[in-house]
């Protein structure tokens, strides 16, 4: 990670850390870096989620892009994967998404996509950071016809919706509960599943700028669980604020997380001979039960650091077509270049329809080990160096010794927030509580801010 860019672009509290001034510079410098080798006038697509700060940052970012002669296509509210899809298929120079994903409304973020629809390489981010830190802005300042033009492009949303529908199956007879998190999916998910002939009920579809991810969506699926049981739905589908992740709920109201979703899609593709190299790419956060289920089906796995960008890097480098995270980021490279919650939902429901199986039946092959994750607020300067604190390193080693191989511990910094995450898996909830609580107590005593 760089000075400004984290694992998923630039993020911070809107108007405090991520200011309009910074957004303008990101537009100006990012646009320049991503389009300097273009032979024709560059085109950049810009979208946002439903946060109250989105329009403020959008205006500043677009001003920066226009100031270096870029033609900007303004998409309005659209899912993050919609941007990557449109950039790639419409042959744009780049795309920019204004969102803080699953974070609360006070935060926002800016992330760039290259012309291939993928997030930026580290080298490109460092080039933008160098311009941000330069003492003087020496970039060209065109005037008159050299300035960029702004184009409203609402057709982008319709094109993305049509793409999603073309990947699915007729869902006639399937009853679906949707939770669009008062976020970007609130403008598209209803249309997509109605076009697929599903019988739908929707919550989290009334964004007001402040209620995005607020007790709702993929990080808060409790309301969706209740809705599924109340409406006797076959499946519940919960997206996050920018709709790049999906958490599902089965017909009994039980959570089906990213691990189980990846297993279901991976097994389906494997049985059809469509799973590239018969391998799924996942992260260190995936549950032991997920690994055991893959082993039982003869499916291979590759494990990366946490963050969908690392999953995508592994997939691109070695030619895999399915990967993701327990949190619900699922990348299906045959269709899109980034995690896509609505695409994943369409594929999951297609599998249910084609197999005639309930979601609980499809997910039953994965027996999840009890897992506990605690987030501890720490100073940003300490979260990367926690393992250098002797007391923390010692307690982790002690707990791992007590596990004797029957479980695992993972202590890692958040890529987007000032948090240290302490996670453990073990055969019982009592053991998990003991391991996590013991380590967390030491972390709080040594470097915690709470």
Swiss-Prot record:
The keyword NAD does not apply. The active site is at residue 101. Its cofactor is Mg(2+). InterPro entries: A-D-PHexomutase_a/b/a-I, A-D-PHexomutase_a/b/a-I/II/III, A-D-PHexomutase_a/b/a-II, A-D-PHexomutase_a/b/a-III, A-D-PHexomutase_C, A-D-PHexomutase_C_sf, A-D-PHexomutase_CS, Alpha-D-phosphohexomutase_SF. The modification Phosphoserine is found at residue 101. Mg(2+) binds at residues 101, 240, 242, 244. Activated by phosphorylation. The keyword Metal-binding applies. NCBIfam families: glmM (TIGR01455). Belongs to the phosphohexose mutase family. This is Phosphoglucosamine mutase. It comes from Streptococcus equi subsp. equi (strain 4047). The lineage of its organism: Bacteria, Bacillati, Bacillota, Bacilli, Lactobacillales. The gene is glmM.
């Amino acid at each position: 990670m760089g000075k400004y860019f984290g694992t998923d672009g630039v993020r911070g509290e809107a108007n405090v850390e991520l200011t309009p001034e910074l957004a303008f510079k990101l537009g100006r410098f990012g646009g320049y870096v991503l389009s300097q080798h273009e032979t024709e006038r560059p085109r950049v697509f810009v979208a946002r989620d439903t946060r109250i700060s989105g329009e403020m940052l959008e205006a500043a970012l677009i001003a920066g892009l226009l100031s270096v002669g870029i033609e900007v296509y303004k998409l309005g509210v659209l899912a993050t994967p919609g941007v990557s899809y449109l950039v790639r298929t419409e042959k744009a120079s780049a795309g920019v998404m204004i969102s803080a994903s699953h974070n609360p409304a006070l935060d926002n973020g800016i992330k760039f996509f290259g012309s291939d629809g993928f997030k930026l390489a580290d080298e490109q981010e460092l080039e933008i950071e160098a311009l941000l830190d330069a003492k003087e802005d020496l970039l060209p300042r065109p005037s008159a016809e050299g300035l960029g033009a702004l184009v409203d492009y609402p057709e982008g949303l319709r094109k993305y919706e049509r793409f999603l529908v073309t990947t699915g199956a007729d869902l006639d007879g399937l009853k679906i509960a949707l939770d669009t998190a008062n976020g970007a999916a609130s403008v598209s998910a209803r249309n997509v599943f109605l076009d697929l002939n599903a019988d739908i009920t929707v919550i989290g579809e009334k964004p007001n700028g402040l209620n995005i991810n607020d007790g709702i969506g993929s990080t808060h699926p409790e309301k969706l669980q209740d809705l599924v049981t109340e409406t006797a739905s076959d499946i519940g589908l919960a997206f996050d604020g920018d709709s790049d992740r999906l958490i599902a709920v089965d017909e009994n109201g039980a959570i089906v997380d990213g691990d189980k979703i990846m297993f279901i899609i991976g097994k389906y593709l494997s049985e059809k001979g469509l799973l590239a190299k018969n391998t799924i790419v996942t992260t260190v956060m995936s549950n032991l039960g997920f690994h055991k289920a893959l082993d039982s089906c003869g499916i291979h796995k590759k494990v990366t650091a946490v963050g969908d960008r690392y999953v995508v890097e592994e997939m691109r480098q070695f030619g895999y077509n399915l990967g993701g995270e327990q949190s619900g980021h699922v990348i299906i490279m045959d269709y899109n270049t980034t995690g896509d919650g609505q695409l994943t939902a369409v594929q999951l429901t297609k599998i249910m329809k084609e197999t005639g199986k309930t979601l609980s039946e499809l997910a039953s092959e994965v027996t999840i080990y009890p897992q506990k994750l605690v987030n501890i607020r720490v100073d940003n300067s300490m979260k990367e160096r926690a393992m250098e604190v002797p007391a923390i390193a010692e307690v982790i080693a002690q707990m791992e010794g007590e596990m004797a191989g029957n479980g695992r511990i993972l202590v890692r910094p958040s890529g987007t927030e000032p948090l240290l995450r302490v996670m453990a898996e073990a055969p019982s909830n009592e053991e998990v509580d003991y391991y996590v609580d013991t380590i967390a107590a030491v972390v709080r005593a040594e470097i915690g801010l709470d």
